[in-house]
Amino acid sequence: MKLLLLCLGLILVHAHEEENDVVKGNFDISKISGDWYSILLASDIKEKIEENGSMRVFVKDIEVLSNSSLIFTMHTKVNGKCTKISLICNKTEKDGEYDVVHDGYNLFRIIETAYEDYIIFHLNNVNQEQEFQLMELYGRKPDVSPKVKEKFVRYCQGMEIPKENILDLTQVDRCLQARQSEAAQVSSAE
């Protein structure tokens, strides 16, 4: 019985520690540098994120610059071929908020992160007369826990993005081969 209570106590402590790792403000941007994988993608205009959509991109890594700007290295498919793109995103005055021009003007912010596990972004895009919003879930590994995915779905629902507009990118070609061949080229050059 004591062993059972001890195990239960340890489980509760561990669960509490995991929740404390989640950051929703006062972000330490240096901790988001490094490799990431696109996990879930959602938009209120689904065509933007479907195959051949202008916002269907697959993150490779994020680099933080000395002025707190971010460089996102991503892949997108052009005529069925994975193509590398880099986007420089400028820090705004608000915590965790950035802007970038890509298929219009984009203003995005970090919703929450557990630096070593996942990060969730919300983006608003304005392109001429059309506006849309987009949500992204990135993971440090090729997939994240169902609990994190459920949290992302709840955020999307809060932003009035329907569940059917959430794409699970772990089920599609995310250009992982292009990412691996780039890493192999870098290591052979060193």
Curated annotation (Swiss-Prot):
GO MF assignments: odorant binding; small molecule binding
Region entry No IgE-binding, spans: 100-109
The keyword NAD appears for this protein: no
InterPro entries per UniProt: Calycin, Lipocalin, Lipocalin_CS, Lipocln_cytosolic_FA-bd_dom, Maj_urinary
Compartments (UniProt record): Secreted
Covalent S-S links between cysteines: 82-175
Domain of life of the organism encoding this protein: Eukaryota
Glycosylation sites: 52, 67, 90
One GO CC term, this protein: extracellular region
Keyword Glycoprotein annotated: yes
Pfam families: Lipocalin
Secretion signal span: 1-15
Tissue: Expressed in saliva (at protein level). Expressed in dander (at protein level). According to PubMed:22104604, expressed in submaxillary gland. In contrast, according to PubMed:22515174, not expressed in submaxillary gland. Expressed in bladder and skin, but not in tongue.
Region of interest (IgE-binding), ranges: 43-54, 76-83, 91-97, 125-132, 139-152
Keywords of the record: Allergen, Disulfide bond, Glycoprotein, Secreted, Signal
PANTHER family documented for this protein: LIPOCALIN, MAJOR URINARY PROTEIN 1-RELATED
Subunit-level organization: Monomer.
Family note: Belongs to the calycin superfamily. Lipocalin family.
Record protein name field: Lipocalin Can f 6.0101
Provenance organism: Canis lupus familiaris (Dog)
